[in-house]
Amino acid sequence: MFNYYNAFSRNIGWLTEAEQQQLKETKVAVGGLGGVGGDHSIVCARLGISNFHIADMDTYDYANFNRQAGANIDTVGVDKSKVITDTIMKINPEASVKNFHKGISTENLDEFLQGVDVYIDSLDIFALDIRRAVFKRCRELGIPAITAAPMGMGTAMLIFTATSMSFEDYFCFVDAKPSNTEAEVKQIFEDNIIRFIIGVSPSMQQRHYLMDNTRVNIMAEKVPSVCPGISLAAGVLCSNVLKLVLKRGGLIQAPRGLHFDAYRNCLIKTWRPFGNKNPIQRWMFNKIKALLKQQAS
């Protein structure tokens, strides 16, 4: 018969029994279950976190097999949110999982964040509008929000709290205006994706070993991704979720970040005062934009 304290007893030593109880009572919201989100959810479940709000509107496909938790021959065409819910419940039958199978929207955002201790961002890289809305609401509600993006065979992490630099101030996104043409709106979107990538990963370690840059197509909303980066992202992010919940251990908060790249044997702590307005970031933005323009031609 399942017993929570027996199931997670091997955590004790790294955690105290009181801390394990605290994790049992913790609620996390996970936005997006493709890519890193499934891994984040499962690692949190194995830490003993027992309350989840999870959101994804997509189903598994063959193209997910190389990297996504839950993707296998038996789950093709099945809702990602259902598969991850089932996986969490098989790890911890006492867990509570609220499944937002239609995804996150401005209409259900407050419900998604209700009672949440930490928000885990794993939305699709191209879902900027709802990502911005979630981070904005988290700041208003005082909910710590954390993102760890897989970058090649490494991961880059940022934490936003009530006392850190805000998500909007850090990334410096540009909003399209009603007067903009369709071409201008597309360009603004592409530029904002670049801002997000260089903001999450200021050191851009992954650029040194990308073998075929023609596979990076922002306008087609398609970028390469491999499993090692996903697994590393889950380890880094969930370790910091633990620190946020238990309020121990040093936190690296925006405009500071952390990038670990297993391929390059590098661990880099980044610091970008003023976020993407920092001169280094402006230089990186212009460089990547020029490379993409050259690639398109």
Model regions and ranges:
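Phosphate-binding loop/pocket of nucleotide- and phosphate-handling active sites
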Residues: M1-W14, K243-S297
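A short, basic/flexible loop-to-alpha-helix module at the beginning of a structural domain
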Residues: F2-V28, V223
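Hydrophobic/small residue at the entry helix of a nucleotide-binding pocket
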Residues: V36-G37
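Glycine-rich phosphate-binding loop and adjoining beta1-alpha1-beta2 segment
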Residues: I49-N92
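A structured beta-alpha segment of the ubiquitous adenosine-cofactor-binding alpha/beta core
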Residues: G77, S81-V118, S122-R131
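ADP-ribose/adenylate-binding Rossmann-like module
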Residues: V118-T161
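A conserved mid-domain beta-alpha-beta active-site/ligand-binding segment of alpha/beta enzyme cores
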Residues: F167-G229
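Mid-domain beta-loop-alpha active-site segment that forms a flexible
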Residues: K222-V245
